[in-house]
Amino acid sequence: HQKEELGYGIYKGVITSIELEKMIKTDSIVNVNGDKPKQITFLQCVGSRDEKSGNHYCSKVCCVTAVKQAIEIKKILPETDVYVFYMDLRMWGQGFEEMYRTAQEKYGVNFVRGRISEAAATYDNRVQIKAEDTLMGLPLNLNTDLLVLMVGMCASEGTKQLAKSAGIDGLYGFAQSKSEHLYDNFTEQDGLFVAGACKRPSSVNDTIQDARAAAVNILNSI
């Protein structure tokens, strides 16, 4: 809701990655009119790495999620054109860079380095996009059935309140560990440990591994 120019909550064809995931799981990827979409466009870094939203950090999981969802769309709807607008693709983790290449070479997903500046509705319930290809230095005008906003991760209100009351609140409302590199599960409060996405944006796998590390550190401290 901090990116009004993209039309979320105003135009029905503008959805979030979370809403698209529900469509994929139920095999119900349709446009506003209930038809199979001819084109779906992703926009990366919505609410992350953004001066306007105040979140300067990378949310880590968005790039991988967009590529995964783009592939799933092409598997279900091979005739649908899929575009991904990005600033930088950060494919964290083993095998994800290969997945990015597979999306291009096997499934024909179109990756465009650039930003979408504005979105508006068309008479036939599609979404008109004004964008720029920053590699080519060219303005772009596209009509797409669905504009998918890859929303970032932020600290929940519960995390902010708990971290503040415990005296371990850090940047952007996340819990602050003692040292991100050496004592990442420890805090400045003795006996208080942290793990997972309460510290920073984190994938499910990273969160599980971090929780295991925290459990070991707790046992060692007893």
Residue ranges and their predicted role:
Residues 1-222:
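Residues forming the flavin
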